[in-house]
């Protein structure tokens, strides 16, 4: 215990430490920067729709996406650009009413007759004279006006077809409770 008493008897030496903090004074000599924006505020939307653009979704609004814009197809008597038509594409809906130009593509690119769309024809008289027959021998498309070549109206693509909507009943549609009956289950 003497060691504890000796420690208590010794006077504690004060520890000295100094912290010096430099002080700075800043004087602002420049004026505050002012940012000025130029240009008028836009009034409304920047998209201007043509008068022939139709609301294709039936939601009361028009959008700028391609799938939501419907342009009415032009009539036969109206002029149209050849570059905007899709007659060069080879889809099955276009080939249903096409006159015979696709046959040449099929023969040269197909290399053989697959039976689908193949047209079998003969070089004999089809007007009923000299024992000729009055019907088509082919399994392909039949055309009544072989002498006349009429230009067909281009069929609309998926972006040009107007969707058919079911009429709304005034509500949000039939609920499960209406279709299930009074018991609540079928």
UniProtKB/Swiss-Prot annotation:
The keyword Iron does not apply. InterPro entries: PPI_Ypi1. One of its GO terms (molecular function) is protein serine/threonine phosphatase inhibitor activity. Coiled coil: none annotated. The keyword Cell cycle does not apply. Keywords: Nucleus. It comes from the Eukaryota. Signal peptide: none annotated. It holds the Pfam family PPI_Ypi1. Residues 82-94 have a biased composition (Low complexity). GO terms for cellular component: nucleus. Residues 122-137 have a biased composition (Basic and acidic residues). Regulator of type 1 phosphatases which maintains protein phosphatase activity under strict control. PANTHER family: E3 UBIQUITIN-PROTEIN LIGASE PPP1R11, E3 UBIQUITIN-PROTEIN LIGASE PPP1R11-RELATED. This is Type 1 phosphatases regulator ypi-1. The gene is ypi-1.
């Amino acid at each position: 215990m003497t060691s504890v008493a000796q420690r208590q008897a010794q006077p504690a030496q004060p520890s000295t430490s100094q912290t010096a903090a430099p002080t700075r004074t800043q004087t602002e000599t420049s004026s505050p920067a002012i940012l000025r924006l130029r240009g008028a505020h836009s009034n409304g939307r920047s998209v201007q729709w043509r008068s022939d653009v139709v609301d294709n979704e039936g939601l009361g609004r028009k959008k700028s996406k391609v799938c939501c814009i419907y342009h009415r197809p032009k009539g036969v008597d109206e002029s149209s650009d050849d570059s905007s038509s899709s007659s060069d594409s080879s889809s099955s809906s276009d080939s249903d009413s096409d006159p015979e130009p696709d046959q040449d593509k099929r023969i040269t690119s197909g290399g053989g007759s697959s039976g689908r769309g193949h047209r079998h024809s003969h070089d004999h008289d089809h007007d009923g004279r000299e024992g000729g027959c009055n019907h088509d021998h082919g399994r392909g498309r039949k055309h009544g006006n072989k002498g006349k070549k009429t230009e067909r109206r281009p069929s609309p693509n998926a972006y040009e077809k107007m969707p058919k909507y079911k009429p709304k009943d005034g509500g949000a549609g039939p609920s499960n409770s209406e279709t299930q009956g009074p018991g609540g289950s079928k």
